[in-house]
Amino acid sequence: MSEEKSGLVQRLMQGSLVTQIMVGLVAGIALAWLSKSHALAVGLLGELFVNALKAVAPLLVLVLVISSIANHQQGQKTNIRPIVMLYLLSTFFAAVVAVVASHLLPQNLTLQNASSQIVPPSGILEVLHGLLMSMVTNPIEAVMKANYIGILVWAIGLGFAFRHSSEGTRTFLNDASDAVTRLVRIVIRFAPVGIFGLVASILASTGFDALGQYASLLGLLLGCMLLMALVFNPLLVWWQIRRNPYPLVFTCLRESGVTAFFTRSSAANIPVNMALAKKLGLDEDTYTVSIPIGANISMAGASITITVLTLAAVHTLGIQIDVGSAILLSLVASVCACGASGVAGGSLLLIPVACNMFGIPNEIAMQVVAVGFIIGVLQDSAETALNSSADILFTAAACMAEDRRLEQNA
């Protein structure tokens, strides 16, 4: 009997993770439909999974980046610059897509009372100030509070410092990196159970009834995100690899986007993207640095959310904007999106910054934020799926482009 049990456990541990996640997804939907009380109860499984990812992700980023930079050999190529360029281009293009879509399909908002407890940044300078302050925070505090900008700055600095250390120290860092990666792999194997709990509890607690009156706005948001995921991001990938991008696009959406959709945190999805990068055979020196960076600056979904909701408020209030203002909004939305990194629903709190460009008072801007929270069940999930899947997508594209260039020069 014990042999049968061990065989079952082994099959579960070695089976297709994507298939198991889809089974968990379907099971979660079925449970929410059959029994609301039981579905709410299994929400604990989802909370445990998300918290486990969030707990291990800061340590993973710190150790991997330090190890990668410390063990980097002179002459090795990491391809970080083209990857960062792809991240920023995607974030800006997303804002432009949202501006055009909002012009073609203008939205009207039924504004609700906003929560007085929400305190958004007062302007774009405050967003930049916050980013700079995050960079110079205490490293232990950065890890404890999952401040990924601070973690990256300290990890990069320590990585360069450890380049001058002994071979034994660098070997220890490499072993520590392997140990943390093994822990992460164990956590990721519980994704099907975690997603089962998340799906069941989310559907049982909210359903989709509350989204009915906001279907048009939600449809525009999701439509823009689908356009980025299925049209513009693939175009950027094709520009890099010069062949059909869709096999890679669908792999990233399936294996990274699905998990990110339910965790609703790019930071929590870092371990998932790391595992996929290893599976794709990408250069470890590249992806251990580029994926954590992407979790902070690859924010196409957040850029769309900020732009669409701001322009919905603008249209509702009858404010006319010119092309120059629309372009400036795209830039502001892109910068604000980077400031929303790693926070579930963070993009909504930066909407008042964009609204301030058009003289919209904070009281009204906060009502727009409230509308965002009402549709946040799907909006935040889709936003995170786009953001996080793009991290691994552009990392893979840049690595493949570099391999192609090396083959041509060989």
Swiss-Prot record:
The keyword Membrane applies. This is Serine/threonine transporter SstT. Keywords: Amino-acid transport, Cell inner membrane, Cell membrane, Membrane, Symport, Transmembrane, Transmembrane helix, Transport. One of its GO terms (biological process) is serine transport. The keyword Transmembrane helix applies. It is found in: Cell inner membrane. GO terms for molecular function: neutral L-amino acid:sodium symporter activity. It comes from the Bacteria. The chain crosses the membrane at residues 15-35, 49-69, 82-102, 118-138, 142-162, 190-210, 217-237, 299-319, 331-351, 358-378. Involved in the import of serine and threonine into the cell, with the concomitant import of sodium (symport system).
